[in-house]
Amino acid sequence: MYYSKIILNYIKENLTTVLKPPVGFIRYPFIDPGSVYDGNVWDWDTYWSVYALLPLSKELKDKALRERIIEHAKGNVLNMLDFQLSDGYIPMMIENKLFDKRLSEPYLNIQHKNGVTMNMHKPFLCQQIALISKDIGDYTWIDEIKLEKLKKYFFCYEKNYYKERVGLYVWHDDIMIGMDNDPASFGRPKDSTANIFLNSFMTMELQSGAEIFTALGDPGYARQLSEKRLRLIDAIHEECFDRRDKFFYSVDVDVYTRKYDWFHQGLGVFWKSLPIRIAVWSGFLPMLAGIATKEEAEALREHLHDEEAFGSDYGIPTLAKNEKMFNIEATNNPSNWLGPIWLVANYCVFKGMLNYGYRKEAEELCAGSVRLLERDIEKTGCMHEYYNPFTGEPVMKGGFINWNVLVLNMQKELDDRE
């Protein structure tokens, strides 16, 4: 058995605690992250839960549990589609109505209806649908009505978050962006940051969307999504890969020639973006998405070995240690992505390294992750949301499960490729 017995046994004992029944205005069963997030449906959190639990459900050889996981995985998607608004908007999170009994629908939807522009469901909706469908060998649970909802979802992204001039997607603001306080977006002007996190995962979302529409008999729309993906990849290479530092950065797209009276009548701003040269773990995501060139991937591998920036015995610091914003203190709302170890970041960089044949680096990330969680479980009796990159000590939010299960994926994927 390639799994850590300590981690596997803990997850087996606690797995069902995150499989939630319908509650409040949430009509379908769903998976929550555990800990303080109990009873709410989250966008990318549910994706990574399903990503980890589906292969594990096969390994456990418990048919009833596997069927239950699949039911809850589908429920994640159905709940999100249930609260899609007429313009295609889908919220990032659906809170349990018991959180605020005055609400008749998700808070984010209420804000959107009131004309407040908000970020929307991160680009993991089609990825989760494709993940489930490929696992069970069936896409037909997504019917014609749901396909139209997916088209409206992509339309909403294009209309509200796509900057055609630069060919990249932007966060509207810094609310619920996944990496809560990523300094490339946190505290910056609205609609100004084309975040490498958002754009890397969007290439994967467009690919998954194309797979869904192909499987369900709409090759024309699938082709449109594939073409958009290729254009986006070109823009990421052109705008986000820094030829000086050999690293992928988020970029500032709020760059224009601002004329005033008779000033600035000559050569204007001809560049489309400015690099936000902050070394964040998300700079490695083009390797996860499979869009980095071999040369870019080799440069990223070298960055991973930069001890002053990303060195840790427990994985990858979410922000380079030599950035002035580096901070590992406990904070909630926003959670802290300014350097602590997060298992989802460890997995994404692990998988990217494995994609490009860098097995040694993948093994080191896996070993650090196993070391981290085994020690936490033995010492505290549970897993936490994020960790100190120097000591491996948990920072906060005990009882967190969610993407920490990805450590088992790491072990299995290394074993599968031997």
Name what the model sees in each region:
Residues A297:
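Short, conserved charged micro-motifs
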Residues G24-N40, I90-M118, V166-D191, D245-S282, ...:
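Carbohydrate-binding/catalytic loop surfaces
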Residues Y3-I6, D87-I94, K159-V170, F201-K294, ...:
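Catalytic cores of carbohydrate-active enzymes
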Residues Y2-N14, R68-P91, K97, S133-I196, ...:
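Active-site acid/base region of carbohydrate-active enzymes
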Residues M1-D38, Y139-W141, K151-K159, F213-T214, ...:
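Acidic/polar, glycine-enriched structural segments that form the non-catalytic walls/loops
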Residues G39-V170, I196-N199, T203, V280, ...:
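Aromatic-rich carbohydrate-recognition surfaces in CAZymes
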Residues R301-F310, L319-K324, P334-S335, C348-E418:
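Non-catalytic C-terminal accessory modules of carbohydrate-active enzymes
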Residues S4, L8, E13-P21, G39-N40, ...:
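Short acidic-aromatic active-site loops that bind/stabilize oxyanions
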